[in-house]
Amino acid sequence: NLDLRIAYARGFRSPSLRELYFNFFDANHQIIGNPDLKAETSHSFTGSLSWKKISPSEVAYTTIFSGFYNNVTNLIDYAVSANDPNIFILTNVSKSKTAGVSLTSVVKYKNWNVAVGGSYTGFYNVYVEEDKELPQLQWSAEANTNIGYNFSKIGLDANLFYKFTGKKPGYVFDNTTQEYIQSEMKGYHMADFTMNKKLFKHFSLNAGAKNIFNVKSIKNSVIGNSVHASNGISNIAYGRSYFAGLSFNWNKK
């Protein structure tokens, strides 16, 4: 069973009132609105090819290969102030492009549900406007796995999610040499575990752990003269956390 889909979309987004006029201040950073923001416009292309099969032993297979390309004009984004690195100002990026491909496979058998996927995404290099020799897109890989099992006799679902984010390349401008130098953010691993238990007819109990590997920050490095030098860190998460909750779902039939 094959399914091919191709789509095109023309996008338009006006800046929100928050982006135009809202100013936010706290102890760590400041965000400044910009009343001169222009509306975003974009062209988006997507495509996917999916394959499904159910074997005689009732194993269900699904594989999806997809790709996308986005071309955005006047992208609304945050820029660091030249006077203070703790101040972020909303601005328009004249050009921005993203592209990528992904492959996902899902296998379902009885109470098991296993999904494995990967993607390769290219992010626009803003410095290419100043130096045409730089690559237009900077590529980064991701891989993820989700394993779920349903304990049907006791009404319990357990799910383990894992994701690897590969190193993300970039460029920085060296004021000393007046050159663009390649940089990169290191890759990292994330994992979550959740459980859901049905209680009575309308209640369910959920609990689990997020960010099991306790990832908080990732090192950035600058690559120059075949030497990797530390260039600070990027904060990406709050660390490991645990949660538990009780939910109520009422459906009148």
Over which residues does each language-model region extend?
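Outer-membrane beta-barrel signature, preferentially recognizing the C-terminal barrel domain
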Residues: 1-3, 10-71, 82-108, 136-140, ...
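Transmembrane beta-barrel domains of outer membrane proteins
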Residues: 5, 9, 48-52, 104-108, ...
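Transmembrane beta-barrel strands of outer-membrane/channel proteins
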Residues: 6-10, 19, 63-69, 116-120, ...
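C-terminal beta-signal and adjacent terminal beta-strands/loops
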Residues: 12-13, 73, 110, 152, ...
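Outer-membrane beta-barrel translocator domains and adjoining extracellular loop/strand segments
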Residues: 18-23, 30, 75-84, 121, ...
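A general structural signal for well-ordered alpha-helical segments in protein cores
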Residues: 46, 158, 243-244
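Gram-negative outer-membrane beta-barrel transporters
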Residues: 57-73, 89-173
